[in-house]
Amino acid sequence: MDRTTIVSDINALLHITAGCLANWLDEILPRVTDSWWEDCVLSSLSYSQREVAENRNFSKLSDFDLAALLRIADKSWYDMRTVAYLPTSERECVRDMISVRNNWAHCSAELPDKDTILRDLNIILKFAQQVNCEHAVYSKISELTAFIEKPGSIAVPPQRAE
C-alpha cells in the first residue's frame, strides 16, 4: 500500500463517518426544539459555512461536509444533552475528530508518521462507534490499522543530504 492509498483510505473513512454523523444528528436535533434547523444547525456554522448552506439551499444535514457537521455537533452539544444522554467523553471525541479531519484535509506532501496515523485511526474508530456507523466500517478501520501496525508498512523517506 503506497502513501497515496493510505491518504485516500483515511479520507474515504472520514467521508463515511460524515454520513453516520449526519444520521446521528438527524435522530437527536429535531427533538431539541421545533426550530432546530435555525437554532442548532445554522447558528452553529461559521460565517463561510452558513453562506455556503444558504447559497446552495441546504435543507438536510447530509448536505453538509464533515467539518460543518462536527461543528454543528460540538456547538449544539449542550442543547442535545437536554434530550439525550451524551457523556462529556463523547464531546471530547467530537473535538478529537475535528483535529483528525483537519490533519487529513490539510495533509502535506509528507505522510504523517506512523504514530499519528494510528492515533487518528483509533479516534476515527471510537467516533464511528459513537455515531453508530455500520460494523463494516469498524472492519475497514481495523484492517487499515493492522496494516499500518506492521513493521515496514510505511517506508521512512531517506534523509536528504544538505
Regions found by a protein language model. Name each.
Residues 1-162:
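Amphipathic alpha-helical interface elements
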